[in-house]
Amino acid sequence: MRRRQTLVLGATGLLVTAAAIGIYFYGAFFGWWARPTVRNAPEAEPAAVEQLASGLRYPFDLAFLPDGSALVTERESGRLRQISPDGGLTDVRIIDEIAEPTVQAGLQGVAISPTYERDGWIYVYYTTEHDSRVSRLRLESSAPLEPILTGIPSGKIHNGGRIRFGPDGMLYITTGEADDRPRAQDQKDLGGKILRVTPAGKPAPGNPTAGSPVYSWGFRDPQGLAWDDKGQLYVSDFGHHNLDELNRVTPGGNYGWPEVEGTGGEPEFTDPIATWKPADASPSGMTYHDGRIWIACLRGERLYRIATDGSSPQQLLTGQYGRLRLVTPAPDGSLWVLTNGRSGPDHDLILRVTP
């Protein structure tokens, strides 16, 4: 933590120092609480919702293949499943390398190679007994998974786990600090970071530090990432007790955790563009669609739709389908939404939402 030193000169100095300390703590605490958060966001116009599939077990992520079907991961079972556009489910593979799953560990992210029709690669993020890692496989092959990035910290909680290819063709990976807070500020550690690697898992050209996969840091448990139509990256971060965050991410940016949660106003940290109370949000998967950012919320049991500057928030589906894990655009222009832990382990849904 940063240390502040104060020179005290007699009684007057003591009074001045006391006043300064009072002002500092007032600003640091009361001013922090006064920072704007997304509260009482209005309900958006009702959306058309269709139940596309049921009987899933804690799904975490979903990615579309070129043929219009999608792959969905189940965190606890380790199953990678394929869903057709009309909702038919087929088991593709069980990722049996995962550690015994916990409430926040297991099979998590999935991404499709941007050159899939040429190379056929599918990428998955999962926790093992020793680490979290990204591996790749081919749909029609029973060959062992090919690890491309290993050594990401893992724990019972705070494992991040979302993976997406960016507009630049590089693979972006969200990692949590695995319940070890100092990791997030250690630039040599892979926990509490956004990582950026080539499709082969090597540090991507142009990263802030040559030879390092670290793109930005200071995150607690980031589970959502998306790009707008100008190529700007946004990341959602799951807060502790105070505030969740929506961040506009730049290479080399430090987003504050554990020094700051929410808006701190410190020059060495990048403040979020929007914050929520965890009871209202607890953000997970997110996307950019129709000019706005969409975020699926776990504790908040809703979708948030918000402008890219953090303004004009609206909420949808509030309390209707339980905890929401992911929202992602489908080829037909709709949004597909994953529920998470809906009244039982095998009761989760895939919803098709047309705003």
Model-derived segments and spans:
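Blade/loop signatures of beta-propeller domains
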Residues: 24-48, 202-208, 254-269
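Beta-propeller blade signature
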Residues: 134-141, 187-199, 249-250, 350-355
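N-terminal Sec-pathway targeting helices
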Residues: 1-17
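Repeat-solenoid scaffold signature
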Residues: 214-242
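Short, surface-exposed recognition loops and adjoining beta-strand edges that mediate ligand/DNA contacts
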Residues: 151, 158, 204-224
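C-terminal soluble interaction/assembly domains
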Residues: 311-321
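Acidic, Gly/Ser/Thr-rich repeat motifs that build Ca2+-stabilized beta-propeller blades
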Residues: 22-180, 232-239, 280-313, 328-355
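Repeated scaffold domains used in trafficking and secretory/extracellular systems
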Residues: 324-326
